Amino acid sequence: MVQTIDQAASLRGTVSLPADKSISHRSALLSALGTGRSRVYNFPDSADPQSTLDCVRTLGIEAGRNDEGVLAIHGRGLGGLHPPSEPLDCGNSGTTMRLLSGMMAGQEFGSVLTGDESLQQRPMERIADPLQAMGARIDLRSGHAPIRIRPQRSDGLRPLEYRLPVASAQVKSCVLLAGLYASGRTVVIETTPSRDHTERMLGLEVQEVGGERHIIVEEDHTVPAVDWSVPGDFSGAAFFLVAGTLVPDSELHLDDVGLNPSRTALLDVLDGMGADITVENERVQGSEPVGDITVRSASLSGIDIGGRLIPNLIDEIPVIAVAAACAEGRTEIRDAEELRVKETDRLHAMAQNLEALGAKVQEREDGLIIDGNGPNLLGAAVTSHDDHRIAMAMGVAGLVAHGTTTISDAECARVSFPGFWDELSRVSVS
């Protein structure tokens, strides 16, 4: 599908966001490991969380929606999963594959985890290494999926104290889930904090030791049946926060947005660039902070982004690059080499696409240098590289660029935000 975007005169209205993808994945997996019925309110229809739900069903877990759309998942406890009769298809979802691998590593039956062509190119040694250190028997194909996990011995996995070599919520969560099946205390040590949904939702002990976070899974930790309420996805909100900032005479409202501090570094970056964003009605929903956001048009200035900020805005860097291209002055993004092993090489994809729109971009091994010249992009033909975040970031760029922008393979936005293009059109004023 080719999506056509014309320059917008303004953006107005209240944005309808999809449910938070990260929390949705975890709600399905943890509900499967609980004992009894859990309910998930606002579970999304986007492709990635559906991949997780499909895998849970393949493991013998009953899950379905009632007439009000509430998802009920009937968990069978840590030892109640059934051997899968077919490979566990994770689709395009790295979160599904990495977190599910932690669960499967502790089972007394074997499993194979696979995914689409893109997912089979993403690195999986980063989860295989700690799982093998716990005694899991895992085979990869040249460091990638399919992942073959052989049956675990009845005495369980070995406990592990694991220091994350890089900040990664997926690797951390994989080890924590495997730790539920270990014969002793498992500790994951973070030097740089990453998103913390897993430890929040599991209710794990977290200790601050010498500037590091120690997340602890005790041998006897159980997973209760819980009713989860999934807030709006902050990563989905990010596109409208940047769009509402860049398009003149705009005012957008985003309600019930997840505001987990490990996810919202974009707010700090945009504030530092000069954005006009307010957060109101802050509250706690389950284990997660939630609030309502209003964004109004503002002129931006360049900024330096790197270090400990990066793990807490890694998904937002493509749309930050759009903001930087429309700001006045230089923006430097560094320490973001993780973006080279996402659904596509996001650093290269954004550099290529923004240059096509007339931006001045230098690509570095771990980031980008963008010399902004105000909102002076020119419409052009660009490609999503079949990456949902690239597609949506370029949709935002198209709203600002003079003329018409076309985005090829734009249907991939449905991976995380099925109604994105309709929502963008609905709030746009020509």
From Swiss-Prot:
GO terms for cellular component: cytoplasm. The keyword Transferase applies. NCBIfam families: aroA. Catalyzes the transfer of the enolpyruvyl moiety of phosphoenolpyruvate (PEP) to the 5-hydroxyl of shikimate-3-phosphate (S3P) to produce enolpyruvyl shikimate-3-phosphate and inorganic phosphate. PANTHER family: AROM/DEHYDROQUINATE SYNTHASE, PENTAFUNCTIONAL AROM POLYPEPTIDE. It comes from Salinibacter ruber (strain DSM 13855 / M31). Belongs to the EPSP synthase family. This is 3-phosphoshikimate 1-carboxyvinyltransferase. Its main location: cytoplasm. The active site is at D315 (proton acceptor). 3-phosphoshikimate binds at K21, S22, R26, S168, Q170, D315, K342. PROSITE patterns: EPSP_SYNTHASE_1, EPSP_SYNTHASE_2. Keywords: Amino-acid biosynthesis, Aromatic amino acid biosynthesis, Cytoplasm, Transferase.
